C-alpha cells in the first residue's frame, strides 16, 4: 500500500513538474511559430470550446437592438464593424465578456439588469475595448500552453465547468491596469456616440455592493472604477442621443427577463 501511495505521489509530482516546466518555455520561439499562427489556431479551438456551451439567442427583438448599439459604437469610433462578432447568450448570469476570435458575448441576464441603453453600451464598450486594445490575443499567447493542454486532456468534453475554466484562463491575463484601460476606452466610445459617459459610473455604483454578479465580481472595485470615470473629461453635452426607441428597449428587456 505504501508503495502504491509513493508511486501515485511521484506520478503527481512529475505531472505538475512537467506542466510547470512546460509553461516556462516560450514555445513560439522554440517551434518558430508566429503569434498570428498560434493565436489563430488556438482561438479557433477555444471558441469552439466556449461556444458549444452557449445557448445563443436568435430573437430579433434582442439581436437587432444589440447589433444597432454596436454598429453605432463602431461608426462613431472608426472601428471596423467586421472586426467584432456579437453573440447574445440566454442565461440569468449577469455577465458579458470578450473572448477569442473577436467575439463579444453578452448575456440576457446582463441586458435585463441595465437601466437604459447607455449603461448597456458602457458594458459593451468595455468589452469592445478589450478586443480593440489586443488584450484578448495577448492573454491567449500568455496561456497558450495551458489552454492547449486543457483542450487535449478534456477532448470533446463540453461540461459547463470546463468552459468556465477556459474563460477564466483567458481573463487571467487581463490585469487591473488593462481593466482600467478598457474602462477608459469604453467610456470614450460611448462619449463619441454622444451618450452620457457618466452612466458607466452610475452602472458601477448601482452594483457596488453586489458581489454575486459575475460581471462585477470579476473586475476591480466598482466604487473606485466609478470614481475614476467621474474624473474623466468628456466632450458630449446634453441633450444626449437616444438610439433605441422606448418600445424597442422595453421589448428587448421583456425577452431577456
Descriptions of predicted regions:
Residues 1-257:
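A Zn2+-metalloprotease active-site environment signal
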